A protein has these predicted regions:
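Donor-binding and catalytic core of enzymes assembling or modifying cell-surface/extracellular glycoconjugates
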Residues: 1-84
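Nucleotide-sugar donor-binding patch of glycosyltransferase catalytic domains
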Residues: 27-30, 68-141
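Extended amphipathic secondary-structure runs
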Residues: 46, 52-53, 135-142
Length: 142
C-alpha cells in the first residue's frame, strides 16, 4: 500500500455472507486481497495484534470495542448505525451523510438476512464511502 502500513484481517472468517447469487456469481464479502489473513484467531490473539498496532480500522463490531478498550484509535466505517452510537465523539468515524444513513434505529434488523437493507437502497450508506474518505481519517493518525 502507498502508506507502507501492514494491514491484517483479524475477523472471525476470511469470507462471510449467505452466498446469495448476484447474477451467476455467489456473493460473499471477502477480506481485502492486500491484507494479511489472520482470521479465525482467538480473542486473546486478536487483542495482541490490536495492542501492537498503530490503530484499528473496522465496522461497528466487538473488535472495534476491543480496540477502543485497549486505548487504540479506532477508524470506524459507519453506514446504517448512527455516528453517535460508538465512542462519541471520535475524530476517526467515517460516515457519508449525503446518502441514506443511520437507519437501524428505525427498523427491526433482520440479522439472518445478509442482504437486507433497511431502506431498500442496496446499502448505499457503505457503498458511498470512498477510499479518499478513509485515507483522510488515516492521515490524521499517522
Amino acid at each position: 500500500n502507498k502508506k507502507n502500513i501492514d494491514t491484517l484481517s483479524i475477523d472471525g472468517n476470511s469470507q462471510f455472507g449467505a452466498g446469495y447469487p448476484l447474477g451467476d456469481i455467489p456473493a460473499y464479502n471477502k477480506i481485502p486481497s492486500a491484507s494479511k489473513d489472520k482470521t479465525g484467531l482467538s480473542i486473546q490473539k486478536a487483542a495482541n495484534y490490536i495492542q501492537k498496532s498503530i490503530f484499528f480500522m473496522g465496522l461497528t463490531s466487538g473488535l472495534s470495542w476491543l480496540a477502543w478498550a485497549l486505548d487504540k484509535p479506532v477508524v470506524m466505517v459507519l453506514g446504517a448505525v448512527a455516528s453517535d452510537y460508538h465512542f462519541s465523539p471520535s475524530p476517526y468515524t467515517i460516515q457519508n451523510k449525503s446518502v441514506c444513513h443511520d437507519c437501524w434505529r428505525k427498523h427491526n434488523p433482520k440479522f439472518e438476512d445478509w442482504y437486507w437493507c433497511p431502506e431498500d437502497k442496496n446499502f448505499e450508506c457503505t457503498r458511498e464511502i470512498t477510499p479518499e474518505m478513509v485515507i483522510e481519517k488515516i492521515d490524521k493518525l499517522i
